[in-house]
C-alpha cells in the first residue's frame, strides 16, 4: 500500500488525510457495501456521467492511456487488488451497463479486514511528514477520530472534489487491466446489428486466458468454448501430427462442432475430451448467443479461417509464466510444460504469425496496477 499512497500523493498533491484514508478503505473493502439494486446503481452512474465535470476525454483514435502516474486518465490503482475506473472511459465507447456490472460484481466479491485497514493506516502515518507532506500529528488526530467512529466509508474532501472532480467506480483491478478489451467489445456489440460477435483469446500458457474468459462470462453472459476440451484423441497422436505447427489440438473437430455452429439457431453441441480417461466424455450444449469467446492456445488456428470479429493475444514474461504454472500445476507438470507444451505453442505462434495477426496484444502482469 505504501507505493500506492505515494503515487496518489504525487499525482494529486491537494489530497488531504481524508482522501488517503478513503483510498486505504477502498483497497481493503472496495465500495464498502453490496449493491442490492443494480438497476438503481446503473441509473446513478448514468446521471453522474451526464453531469460530468471533467470535460471531453479527447482520446486520440479512441486509445486508452497507459497505466501509471502520467497515464491515469481512465484507470488508476487503488491497491489491494482494486482500481478506480473513471467514468471518462465511457467517452471511449465503454457502456455504462458494463462498468456498472464491474462495480456490482466487485462489490459482491471483495473481502477485506479491519486488521488490513489498520495496517494501511499505519503505513500512512509513517509516510506523513516524509514522502507525503502532511503534518503527521494532524493526520494522527484524524485517524484517531476515524477509528473512534468505527472505520466507516468516507467521502472525498471538499478540496479534493474541487481540484480533481473525482468520478469513478471502484472495481477489481482485473477489470482495469483489460479495460481496452472491454471498450473494444462494447463497440463491436453495439455495431453488430443482431449478428453474432465472435472473439478468440489466444496466447502463452499462464498468461491468464481462462481468467479473462471468466471475466467476460460474468460481464456479458457470453458463451465460452475452451480449446482444452479438444485435445487430440489417441488415434490422432502420430509423429506427423506433432510436427505440424498447431497440430497439438483437434482443430478439425473444433471447427465442425463449434466454429461452424456459432450462428446456428440450434446452438452448439460437442463432447469434451477427457485426458484422464483418454476418450470423449460429457456432452456440452450451448444455446446461440450474441457473443461467443473461443479461449485457449490454438484458438486462432488458420484452419478456422476468417471467423472472428476480434483476435486477442495474451502474453506474460517468462519468469512470471513459469511461476504461475508452478503454482497452478506443480513442479512435475511445470517440467512437462517447459519440455513439451510451451515449445509446441511457440512453434505455432511463430509459424502462423499468431501474435502479429492479433488486433489486440495484451501483457498480463501481476503488478500492472
What are these regions (language model features)?
Residues 163-190:
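N-terminal pre-Walker A segment at the start of P-loop NTPase domains
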Residues 1-160:
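Long, basic/Gly/Ser/Thr-rich N-terminal segments
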Residues 209:
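Conserved lysine of the Walker
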